[in-house]
Amino acid sequence: MASAPAQQPTLTVEQARVVLSEVIQAFSVPENAARMEEARESACNDMGKMLQLVLPVATQIQQEVIKAYGFNNEGEGVLKFARLVKMYETQDPEIAAMSVKLKSLLLPPLSTPPIGSGIPTS
């Protein structure tokens, strides 16, 4: 007999704020900050390596926090949490601001080449 699918956790806006705040704080814990820094240094600002090295560490850090709120302890839980946050971003400016902060912790700043330093036109 197949087991029933796990119920997806639901959070109110207030609960989502709390969880998101805890996730952001988790990245400030010295051990986690060191893990992220090591992964970033190993990735050398290469986007492919960032996905291979930084994203898994960031996912683990988030999982440690969100599992206490009913999200599964696999990558799927982080995706469900991200979808929930995305849904609340439009309803709550505080969640929107925290979401931007979280993304800045996860993704490297995009560097664009200075204007005029691209391919020669002649």
From Swiss-Prot:
Keywords: Cytoplasm. GO terms for cellular component: cytoplasm. The keyword Cytoplasm applies. It is found in: Cytoplasm. The keyword RNA-binding does not apply. GO terms for biological process: post-embryonic development. Belongs to the UPF0456 family. This is Protein C10.
